[in-house]
Amino acid sequence: KEDMGSIEAPFKFDTKNSIKDLVIGYLPDAFKNGATKIDKSTLKAIKSLGAKVVKVQLEDLPYMSLINILYAEAAAAFEHLTLSGKDDTLTWQDDGAWPNTFRKARFLSAVDHVQLDRLRYLTMKSVAKLFKDIDVLIGPFDTGPGPMLVATNFTGHPCLHIRAGFEQLASRGAASLSDGKLNTGEAGEGKKFRVPHGISLWGNLFEEGKVLNVGMALEKKLNVWKERPSIDS
């Protein structure tokens, strides 16, 4: 009741529901540059589950700019760290670390905030339009291949991320919030480890059940849900 941005809504999910009457969409560009072999094989797998799978398009908007809202909200939530100087005690102090992100956010102008709120509204309309014709959207998690991770963080659409396979990668570098974008860390050189790679499923507002039903069917098809990285990974 104290959170004016939330809605009390029932959670509806029946594990026995079939997905054969559902429409699953995907953004073709998200499965091109930047997509992995696992991403592409997962798209192929979902086409074999009996549901209708269609290509869809998301309106062309500067979705990554929404990250600036995150900067401002985080800076406001942790303002006491910045004003007290306690942010200096945090271990990580690079450009992309949270302490410097809190500091940089204070240079966003009132005009910036108005424009970002307008962009957020356009994003809400764009994603709502997307889900008028589909029940679930499948796509890579990373922000490189597609915009859905960032876009739905500002619309509230539910997302399920499941293990889709494994790949051999060296340890990743630190995640970064510098340059006005989210970077989840790049794999470096050196010893490689067998690590899980996931795929994301998004659904319409208050329709988590459909997302979970598709996730269950996809997990069964991929048959990697029981596997774990080795202990030295």
Name the predicted role of every residue range:
Residues A51-I69, F102:
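Short connector loops at secondary-structure junctions
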Residues E186-G190, V195-E207, V211-E219, V224, ...:
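Short, well-ordered beta-strand elements
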